[in-house]
Amino acid sequence: MIGDEERLLFANDAFYAAFASADIRAMQDLWADKHPVSVIHPGADIVVGRAEVLASWKAILRDDTGFDIEHRNPVARLLGETGIVLCRERVGTHHLIATNVFVRIVDNWRIAHHQSGPAPLQAKPKQEEQRPVH
Amino acid sequence: MIGDEERLLFANDAFYAAFASADIRAMQDLWADKHPVSVIHPGADIVVGRAEVLASWKAILRDDTGFDIEHRNPVARLLGETGIVLCRERVGTHHLIATNVFVRIVDNWRIAHHQSGPAPLQAKPKQEEQRPVH
């Protein structure tokens, strides 16, 4: 039987599949419609509200037949009716790292928040560079 | 009577107060101890697990009597037993933007996840720079 964590990771896969295929309709269906939603795209400001969040996706996906994105090493964190998936993203040559927050709707998970920002390089940084800004 | 959202913003304030005063004991008390916890510090990799998350804070706060951080414009998003606070951070001269996920423990909120990454400059970018990486 498929478990909560598997379903959560499946929803996360579906989010990146919609992204990669620039499928705005699938993206709409994946975002929660009965919970507050928000997004922080890389280097961009906070976007709050379903209409505003979907408009941000339309702007990103508007003239693409597809999007060169893949995600790696997803980690699922279950917090009851909410679930978080943390993963790495590669968008073209950019390496990013993301927090995706999902809410459970019966047996499905729908996304309520996404933040993505720069990831460290795969190579180990030097000792004096290991300490992050915070 | 104080509401859920006010309590959630209060917990977010407490998180930044612990950070600013480099109070590792307060930080320990603020992080959830019965839920999975994780953190993504700016430009750093995913850290999972309470011991690992607290060790990351100890490394950041270890030789500081205080930390030059302030947060601004917090926005609370209630998802039932989970709450998200989105806010801007200023750390020294760095401008960051954060997702803080909290879990409700009776009447309190404890932090379960934090991601912080670069914020856009306050000035409006030029037209061709407005589109984020994604």
List where the protein language model places each region:
Chain A
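A beta-strand edge to alpha-helix "cap/lid" segment located at domain peripheries
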Residues: 2-29, 37-134
